[in-house]
Amino acid sequence: MFCEHPHVFTYGSSADLDTNLKCDPAKVGAELVKVNRGGDITYHGPGQLVAYPILNLLAKHGGNGPADMQAYVHSVEQLVIDTLTQLGVKNAGRFNGFPGVWIEPNSVTPKKICAIGVRVSRGRTMHGFALNVSTDMTFMREHIVPCGIADYAVTSLLEEGIDV
């Protein structure tokens, strides 16, 4: 399922709102919603493509154990990287230690362009990814610390010179 949300901040079970929420959401025209995924706070809003793949995941090594979450996240990242490459983004990739898709991940100034937050229950995926297309980045830069990552910037396709 693909969608574009109205202004909303969502946060998962490991969120540190005292540190990473820097505004009163109502005062900036956004909702604040707790969701049943891991991770910290993120923003969804106009100009952002959000995808919620609903899939049955295979168990690790083909057995009857838990789903291979790491392989799933890796495949979602690769899907986004391949799509960005087709759109003309030449420097998208993975940034070691941080999920999602990044621009110039091997530079001293990597920028996150796509957040990924998933959960698996009974072998089925929930939640997904959020790709910043023409997003108002003010919501991420001034109102929250996106995904609890203060040391690195966020960006959008539009800011990277890609107008789709």
Where are these regions (language model features)?
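Short conserved catalytic/interaction loops centered on acidic-Pro-aromatic/His motifs
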Residues: 91-94, 126-127, 138-144
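Conserved phosphate/anionic-ligand binding catalytic regions in large, soluble enzymes, centered on
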Residues: 121-135
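N-terminal lobe of the biotin/lipoate ligase/transferase fold
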Residues: 1-110
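Histidine/acidic-rich helix-loop-helix segments that form or flank divalent-metal centers
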Residues: 113-116, 121
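A generic structural motif
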Residues: 56-61, 122, 160-164
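A hydrophobic, small-residue-rich beta->alpha segment in the mid-to-C-terminal subdomain
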Residues: 135-164
